[in-house]
């Protein structure tokens, strides 16, 4: 019973971290269509931020769509929420290195990370 309760708490806190990050991003950008920033270049940055706060999460890549997402809590998540895992596979170290170099966010990463730590109190380490 205790093990099941701990697992449920851990999953709840993983999902809570995911929600906190998305809410913080919504507060930061405050513009229509802001989510597109994380579908066109910012997907690896988001997956990295989420990965820092979600133990056991796995970077996933879709080479067809050139998109990155994070697998945790038995599902695949990006800025849109839970998404289909079709055409995704766990990213190798080489693919992670590729994404770091080529999936370039179209926003000021340093400024956003400072906001997330200072204003939203998210426990971020180094993100890239």
Where are these regions (language model features)?
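A structural boundary/capping signal
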Residues: 1-128
